[in-house]
Amino acid sequence: MIYIVALTGGICSGKTTVSDRFKKIGINVIDTDVIGRKIIEKNKKISDSIKKKFGKKILNKDNSINRFLLRNCIFNEKKSRLWLENILHPEILKKSKKKIKLIQSTWCLWVVPLLFEKKIQKKANRILLIDTPIRIQIRRMIKRDKININEAKKIISYQVRRKKRISLSDDIILNKNKNIEKLSLYIHYLNNFYIYLSKQNNPKNMKKII
């Protein structure tokens, strides 16, 4: 059994920045976004279903799926977004389970952006939230994705509200600036804390693999 810490947060909150810092100190990271991308690229059955559903408007010239175009498409159509999540999510969970089974360390970081939206928080022992003020999320989205403020607000509106994420989380990192030194201190502290929790001899503290 392994102690699973789920890392989550809203769009452009800095989840990748934090998970990369954990990687640098040797923590095993399972990122569901990365798993999802690979499924779309390599699972022919799923990729064919996506192409059939959305057509040429989400394809590159080589007939591969353009994730940016796909994302724009689903965020403008709620039913399409839910359809895509429903065909990807079971496969993502299955792949996550396989990867976690291979880990030999005492704890691992499971990065799940839609942890609360998909109501799977109980599959983790502890929840680490990367929290960012909405105004900063919007600013980062506009810069990263080249979208306007109304589009950014619409995307955020589809996610669980900030207050609810905070209330459901165990540990919180407030990420509103680029203070890497302070972030590194948090990462080292949390690593030691999670090692401590993982070594407690209470079976209830452990997950048998998601």
From Swiss-Prot:
Pathway(s) this gene product operates in, as recorded in its UniProt entry: Cofactor biosynthesis; coenzyme A biosynthesis; CoA from (R)-pantothenate: step 5/5
Catalytic reactions of this protein: 3'-dephospho-CoA + ATP = ADP + CoA + H(+)
A biological-process GO annotation: coenzyme A biosynthetic process
GO CC terms, sorted: cytoplasm
Summary of the function given for this chain in its UniProt record: Catalyzes the phosphorylation of the 3'-hydroxyl group of dephosphocoenzyme A to form coenzyme A.
Protein name in the entry: Dephospho-CoA kinase
Organism the protein comes from: Buchnera aphidicola subsp. Schizaphis graminum (strain Sg)
Domain DPCK: 4-201
EC top class, as a word: transferase
Cellular compartment(s): Cytoplasm
